[in-house]
């Protein structure tokens, strides 16, 4: 049983309104970033007289990024709305798990598009793949912009996931170690 009451425990709730504001702001910032990523990617196409038309739906990594961006935007909107409802705010574990899932999905799509962009920009000479960005420069530039926006979206969700982890685990007290037990060893 604890005999010492931590004075910082009463100050623990002092930062919650600021944390809620930061969390909500990040969620709301992720929405236009995700929508912009989708719009840039879906409208991206370029025609080359030698190789033909290249569209986003020719590349599975870009289709995956559009899908994850749509999921990020919808989830961010839903989570921001749910954070205003008091019964959902008390369910920190729901936000923790769902924020983790969305952050992981976002990083997987960033990695997939980054790999695709690297191959398009540099090629893979050992596999006899030539680089494609010299032929499709505008397409590659828009993919790069979409990748940057999606990476910023991931960063938002990473910070959101850290905040939700803090909320979920801050309700537990740290383990108590009796000083006599430590000295006795």
Swiss-Prot record:
Pfam families: CASP_dom. Homodimer and heterodimers. The keyword Transmembrane applies. InterPro entries: CASP/CASPL (IPR006459), CASP_dom (IPR006702). This is CASP-like protein 2D1. It is a multi-pass membrane protein. The keyword GTP-binding does not apply. Belongs to the Casparian strip membrane proteins (CASP) family. NCBIfam families: A_tha_TIGR01569. Residues 1-15, 86-92, 167-185 are cytoplasmic. Coiled coil: none annotated. It comes from Glycine max (Soybean). Keywords: Cell membrane, Glycoprotein, Membrane, Transmembrane, Transmembrane helix. Its main location: membrane. Residues 37-64, 114-145 are extracellular. It is found in: Cell membrane. The chain crosses the membrane at residues 16-36, 65-85, 93-113, 146-166. Glycans are attached at residues 48, 58. GO terms for cellular component: plasma membrane. PANTHER family: CASP-LIKE PROTEIN 2C1-RELATED (PTHR33573:SF30), CASP-LIKE PROTEIN 4A4 (PTHR33573).
């Amino acid at each position: 049983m604890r005999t010492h009451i931590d004075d910082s425990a009463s100050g623990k709730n002092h930062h919650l309104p600021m944390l809620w504001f930061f969390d909500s702001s990040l969620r709301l910032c992720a929405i236009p970033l995700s929508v912009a990523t989708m719009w840039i990617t879906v409208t991206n196409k370029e025609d080359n007289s030698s190789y033909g038309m290249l569209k986003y739906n020719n590349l599975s990594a870009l289709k995956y990024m559009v899908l994850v961006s749509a999921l990020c935007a919808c989830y961010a909107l839903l989570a921001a709305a749910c954070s205003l409802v008091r019964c959902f705010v008390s369910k920190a574990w729901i936000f923790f798990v769902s924020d983790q899932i969305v952050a992981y999905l976002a990083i997987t799509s960033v990695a997939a598009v980054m790999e695709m962009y690297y191959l398009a920009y540099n090629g893979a000479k050992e596999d006899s793949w030539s680089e494609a960005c010299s032929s499709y420069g505008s397409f590659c530039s828009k993919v790069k912009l979409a990748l940057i926006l999606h990476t910023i979206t991931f960063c938002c969700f990473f910070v959101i996931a850290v905040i939700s982890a803090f909320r979920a685990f801050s309700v537990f007290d740290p383990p108590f170690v009796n000083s006599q037990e430590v000295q006795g060893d």
